[in-house]
Design a protein with these regions (language model features):
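Conserved SAM/SAH-binding beta-strand->alpha-helix loop
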Residues: 138
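N-terminal auxiliary segments of SAM/dcSAM-dependent transferases
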Residues: 1-71
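S-adenosyl-L-methionine
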Residues: 150-186
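Conserved alpha-helix/loop element of class I SAM-dependent methyltransferases that forms part
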Residues: 87-109
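A short, conserved alpha-helix within the catalytic core of class I
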Residues: 210-213
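A short acidic, Gly/Pro-enriched loop at the edge of an enzyme's catalytic core
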Residues: 189-201
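Conserved SAM-binding loop of SAM-dependent methyltransferases across substrates and taxa
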Residues: 118-128
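Conserved class I S-adenosyl-L-methionine
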Residues: 108-117, 133
C-alpha cells in the first residue's frame, strides 16, 4: 500500500467516530508499505497489511467466512474479461468503463471507487485525477488489481467451452498512471477513510451487493 495513504485511514469499527490508526511498519520499499500492522488506539482492533495489500474491513469481516464465489479463479477471470476484454481485442468486449470514466470530472483531488472489483474504472480515472483508491471486499479481486498496478500485466484463463480454456496475457495501457492508484480490501458500508478525503466518488455495480443501499 502506498505510504501516504496512512494519514487518510481511520478505524472502520469505530465509525462514526474517526479514530486514526497507528502503523507498526515491518517492511517498506521506497514509498510502499509491504508488511505492517494498523492498530486502533480506541477499540484495539488490528488491521494487517500483507504483501502490500491492506485489509481494512471491520474486524467481523476478518474472521473465517464461508468461501465466496468471488474468490474463485473462474469468477476472477470472468471479471477480468468483463473489465479488460477490449484490451485483448475481443469483439464482444464492452467499453462501458471507459465511457463511465469520461463522465467524471477531471482536475485535482482524489476519487474513491467503491466496489472497484478488478480495477478498470480506477485505471481509467488515473488519467484525470491525482489519486484513485479502489475498494472491494473480494481479496482475489483486489490482489488481481494490485498485480496489474504493480506489474502492468497479468495472465488469465478464459473459459472456452466446458472445462476447456485458453490462456491470455492482459497488458495495461501505457497512458494509465499506476503511481496514482491504490486498491484496498474494505467494506462499502464501513469506509476506512477520514471525511473529506475524496472529491469524487463512484459506486458502479454496488447497489445490488449491499443490504440497505
Amino acid at each position: 500500500m502506498k505510504k501516504f495513504l496512512l494519514e487518510m485511514l481511520i478505524c472502520p469499527a469505530c465509525l462514526p467516530e474517526e479514530t486514526e490508526l497507528r502503523a507498526d511498519i515491518m517492511i517498506e520499499q521506497a514509498e510502499d508499505v509491504v508488511e505492517a500492522t494498523l492498530r486502533c488506539p480506541r477499540c484495539a482492533s488490528i488491521y494487517p497489511i500483507q504483501d502490500g495489500t491492506a485489509f481494512l474491513g471491520p474486524p467481523s469481516d476478518q474472521r473465517e467466512r464461508t468461501p465466496s464465489k468471488y474468490e474463485t479463479e473462474p469468477v476472477l477471470s470472468s471479471y477480468l474479461w468483463s473489465h479488460y476484454g477490449d484490451l485483448l481485442g475481443d469483439e464482444q468486449a464492452s467499453s462501458a468503463y471507459r465511457q463511465w470514466a469520461s463522465l467524471m470530472d477531471g482536475g485535482s483531488g482524489a476519487v474513491l471507487d467503491v466496489g472497484s472489483a478488478v480495477g478498470r474504472f480506477a485505471f481509467e480515472m488515473s488519467r484525470k485525477r491525482d489519486l484513485v483508491v479502489g475498494i472491494d471486499n473480494s481479496v482475489a479481486f483486489i490482489k488481481a488489481a494490485r498485480e496489474l498496478m504493480a506489474n502492468g500485466r497479468r495472465k488469465l484463463a478464459l473459459r472456452q467451452e466446458g472445462h476447456l480454456s485458453r490462456e491470455e496475457t492482459l497488458t495495461l495501457l501505457e497512458g494509465w498512471q499506476t503511481d496514482r492508484i491504490e486498491f484496498i480490501v474494505a467494506d462499502a458500508l464501513a469506509l476506512p477513510f477520514r471525511s473529506h478525503s475524496f472529491s469524487g466518488l463512484a459506486s458502479l455495480n454496488i447497489i445490488d451487493k449491499v443490504p440497505l443501499p
